[in-house]
Amino acid sequence: MILAIDVGNTNLVLALGSEAGSVDSVWRISTDAVTSADACSKAIRKTLGTKLEEVDNSVIASVVPAITRHVATAMEGVTGRAPLVVGESGVDLGIAVNIDRPEQAGADRVVNAVGAQVHHQLPAVILDFGTATTLDLVGADGAYEGGIIAPGVALSIEALERAAAQLPKLELRAFGDDLPVLGKNTVAAMESGVFWGYVSMIEGLLARLRSADAPASADMPAIVTGGLAPLFARHLAGAVMVDQDLTVKGLLAIFARNTEARHDEGNDG
């Protein structure tokens, strides 16, 4: 099986899956733990345990260039094969990137677009709750058309705590539908600002994207992914679906595409 690794600013998401796109198991490792290839290898071996025996190949997407090579070196040591790294020369993503400087597109955002292209109805908006909150448009033809980057929920909470000395530390939790908009104490007011503030921001951005000219469309669905997807998705208007494995599915699709291409080249030879 393939180990798909999404290297983010906060966590490494590791998922065991097949080239057909099925996902077997998912784990997380703190990005801070990846201080070297050796540290990464130890963390992966400890986290996967006996499941590591099922790993034949690996594919990596990273938005943290400083540790990409650590992860790649670790996986080559684990599998005996060099991993496929999104963004490296010769890797075919199978998707057009229609932005001003395609080489600057975040690997995770393009991989999400591939996942949507392969597994979902298009056009669509991808809403990803990570260190940043991103909204990205994938056109009806499967092309990545650009998007929006806003501060992530946890990042906003941290900034509020740092800048306002009298505000308490706010624990991000599973807010219920009955969370009042009008807070009657400091914590309740902060919770409302974070939760309903983000719901309103996302609804507003989705509405603007859906009302934009082609390649957008008024009825296009929002595909919601990332750790906070279930918390916010149920409050969003229009067609909304949660796909927690979207990035992993995109990585598996890219691996399958490039494996097939190498196989075809071998047959031609």
Model regions and ranges:
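Short glycine-aspartate micro-motif
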Residues: 2-6, 59, 124-128, 134, ...
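Short glycine-rich, Thr/Ser-proximal phosphate-binding strand/loop in the N-terminal lobe
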Residues: 2-46, 50-52, 143-166, 188
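Phosphate-binding/catalytic loop of phosphoryl-transfer enzymes
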Residues: 81-163, 195-208, 268
